[in-house]
Amino acid sequence: MPEFIRVNYETDRRVFLNGEELGRTNETLNSGAGPFRVDMGVPLTYEPSFRRVNPSGTSSDKPLEVDFTAKSAAP
């Protein structure tokens, strides 16, 4: 069954599910059934370094939202 995720981040980045490139940030992506390890590859300028998700009951207009934020600069 199709499932959908949207990885939210402040800039355009590649999105990886279980190490395989799926698409780009800030777009609705057809992920299929999970569970998945979601990350944005290197450089690791974001946090957390990954998220574990298991999309269920999603649609293209109501994807599972997965949020990442930019790492704070070291003082």
Spell out what each predicted region is.
Residues M1-P75:
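Short loop/turn and low-complexity linker motifs enriched in small/turn-promoting residues
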